[in-house]
């Protein structure tokens, strides 16, 4: 088999994965707090037929040698944690982090997951939960007689009750940050898990020590740019077509050899 067939096959596979990444970004263009991915390419091993710098004669050496590439692969996907635009809403339970940090969400097994999606609701006990019913950590429980619900930029949660105009603090939000957010593991439902690559979470008060502030009646939009993704999609399509063309050309060359030799 011509080596070009294998090389082109790796190109098709890599561009297919790249297109899948782009399509996932576009599919989540309206997902609150979504962070786009970028596929990272890496060339495969080379066949060293003539070593660069090897002696060609007693008094001369090869300036470049002969190195034949064997293709390409997707080595990873890089999560881009640049902030999305902020959208004002009329829901007091909607929150966003303006700057670095993640909301902490308690999983059913007791582990902590992390999210930039601040779309919260109240469950039957008055506890702040995600759309899937997972509790915010630290737990915030809103009394049934609460008339107003306020979240400060420092994460202080306060309410007022009927017949009492005095503000009552019922809890404090704490956010988490990571040395390498791109190393977090995506598990769906807008949630991430800590990994060895992300490092241990640094938990703190919003607005202090580099943590972003919390904004009420606000949601963070996806950071996907449709224009940028469409340009990437066209580039990927062209690369896929060119690799397909190489396979067609190599096939024609093989047919010529079998028919004429």
Question: For the regions a protein language model found, what residue spans apply to each?
Answer:
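Amphipathic alpha-helical polymerization modules
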Residues: 1-261
């Amino acid at each position: 088999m011509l080596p070009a067939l294998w090389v082109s096959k790796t190109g098709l596979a890599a561009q297919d994965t790249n297109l899948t990444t782009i399509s996932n970004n576009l599919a989540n263009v309206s997902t609150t707090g979504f962070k786009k991915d970028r596929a990272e390419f890496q060339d495969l091993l080379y066949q060293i037929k003539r070593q660069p710098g090897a002696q060609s004669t007693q008094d001369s050496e090869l300036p470049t040698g002969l190195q034949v590439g064997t293709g390409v692969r997707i080595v990873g996907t890089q999560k881009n944690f640049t902030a999305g635009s902020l959208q004002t809403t009329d829901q007091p339970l909607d929150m966003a982090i303006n700057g670095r940090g993640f909301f902490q969400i308690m999983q059913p097994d007791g582990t902590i997951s992390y999210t930039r999606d601040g779309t919260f609701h109240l469950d039957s006990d008055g506890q702040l939960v995600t759309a899937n019913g997972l509790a915010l950590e630290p737990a915030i429980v809103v009394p049934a007689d609460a008339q107003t619900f306020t979240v400060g930029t420092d994460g202080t949660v306060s309410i007022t009750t009927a017949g009492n105009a005095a503000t009552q603090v019922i809890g404090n939000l704490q956010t988490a940050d990571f040395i390498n957010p791109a190393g977090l593991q995506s598990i769906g439902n807008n949630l991430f898990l800590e990994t060895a690559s992300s490092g241990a979470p640094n938990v703190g008060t919003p607005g202090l020590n580099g943590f972003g502030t919390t904004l009420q009646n606000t949601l963070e939009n996806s950071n996907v740019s449709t224009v940028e993704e469409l340009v990437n999609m066209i580039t990927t399509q062209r690369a896929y077509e060119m690799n397909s063309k190489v396979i067609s050309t190599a096939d024609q060359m093989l047919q010529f050899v079998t028919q004429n030799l």
